[in-house]
A protein has these predicted regions:
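N-terminal entry module detector
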Residues: 29-117
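Cleavable N-terminal export/targeting peptides
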Residues: 1-48
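Residues on the lipid-exposed face of transmembrane beta-strands in outer-membrane beta-barrel proteins
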Residues: 90-96, 149-157, 169-173, 211-217, ...
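Short loop/turn motifs that connect adjacent beta-strands in outer-membrane beta-barrel proteins
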Residues: 35-48, 95-102, 155-165, 219-231, ...
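Transmembrane beta-barrel strands of outer-membrane/channel proteins
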Residues: 51-59, 105-111, 155, 167-175, ...
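Long, positively charged binding patches that form subdomain-scale interaction surfaces
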Residues: 210-243
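A structural/positional concept
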Residues: 144-152, 162-166
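Extracellular/periplasm-exposed beta-strand and loop segments of Gram-negative cell-envelope proteins
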Residues: 60-87, 109-148, 174-208, 238-271, ...
């Protein structure tokens, strides 16, 4: 069901291209469909509300963590793990708009699980050569569940300076649950071994509150595209404090070996959106979004079977996230 919805949303986004590329008779039919949809939207919903529905694709994105050796020679890092994020997400945005402010809420969930990029695990465990990577492994990786939430307040003061430059603030929550599987490992001597089956269960959450600015402008395109009479452009930049929590269960290690990281730091975020008006209450949206999260803090290692439980500082958690989103917006 979810996959079918995703296909429908993608098809809706492609319609905008078709309106430009198709012959006049096909464009006329497309306009009739838009008119009917616009009439339906006008008869439902509540005043001051907008709803977007779309798909998001992550590109060249990952989330990583590393920790040092707490004992001499204190190599840093001792171990580093990098998990890819390149899945498709389905979601939407609910907006409530007043004259001087608006409240926006986004929610997204992953559509597919398997990543096309390999997870990487590296170790520097030779005490005589602390800067020499000694073990490297790659594994297939699936995202069992991924959730993204964003609650944003946009202020629209009537002062002249804020007519196009709007203050924003909000809260974000991200949750990722990965499982690595069917990997291979190679040592410094060139000897390699296969790692069949599941290898690591890794759960991660990010929380960040942020403040920033948003710039909006409008462009009249009625003389170019009949079905796209105008376009809105929006660019937002924000900065916030972030916290991260990790839990890593190594399934191939003896006992029940779990590492935890509790870290804090910051997040930079930038987004650019183009909105294509098809009718007064129907828009197509295309946006690009980038986040960089960097946090530092404590690392804990436990293994209940061997009665191991100790903690130390120096862990680092970071994530680069680039995504492209296509959506349809209905204005009530």
């Amino acid at each position: 069901m979810v996959c079918r919805i995703g296909v429908v949303v993608l098809a809706t986004a492609l319609i905008y291209l078709c309106s430009v590329l198709l012959p006049p008779t096909a464009v006329a039919t497309f306009d009739e469909v838009l008119d009917t949809t616009s009439d339906l939207v006008s008869g439902v919903g509540a005043k001051n509300w907008q709803y977007d529905m779309g798909i998001k694709k992550f590109v060249n994105s990952y989330t990583s963590y590393q920790f040092p050796n707490p004992f001499p020679p204190n190599q840093d890092p001792l171990s580093r793990l990098e998990f890819p994020i390149d899945q498709w997400f389905l979601g939407g945005e609910y907006d409530y708009i007043e004259r001087n402010w608006s409240l926006e809420f986004q929610s997204w969930m992953n559509l597919n699980e398997e990543s096309r990029t390999m997870m990487q695990d590296s170790d520097w465990d030779n005490e005589n050569q602390p800067f020499q990577k000694t073990v490297f492994s790659e594994s297939k990786c699936r995202l069992n569940s991924g959730w993204l939430f964003d609650l944003k307040l946009v202020l629209k003061p009537e002062w002249s300076i804020f007519r196009t430059l709007l203050p924003i603030g909000g809260l974000r929550y991200q949750s990722f649950s990965f499982t690595t599987h069917d990997g291979s490992q190679v040592g410094l001597d060139g000897h390699s071994i296969d790692l069949p089956g599941d290898g690591i269960n890794f759960d991660q959450t990010f929380y960040h509150g942020y403040l920033g600015m948003e710039v909006n402008t409008k462009l009249n395109t009625s003389g170019v595209f009949r079905s796209v009479p105008s376009m809105d452009f929006k660019v937002s930049v924000d900065y916030g404090l972030a916290t991260a929590r990790n839990e890593d269960l190594h399934l191939l290690r003896s006992g029940r070996r779990i590492t935890n990281e509790n870290t804090s730091g910051h997040c930079w975020h930038a987004e650019a959106t183009a909105s294509f008006y098809a009718r007064r209450n129907i828009k197509g949206l295309l946006s690009a979004d980038f986040k960089r999260i960097i946090t530092d803090g404590g690392h804990q290692l436990t293994n209940s079977v061997f009665n191991i439980d100790f903690s130390f500082d120096g862990a680092r958690v970071w994530s680069d996230q680039l995504s492209i989103t296509a959506a349809t917006e209905f204005i009530f």
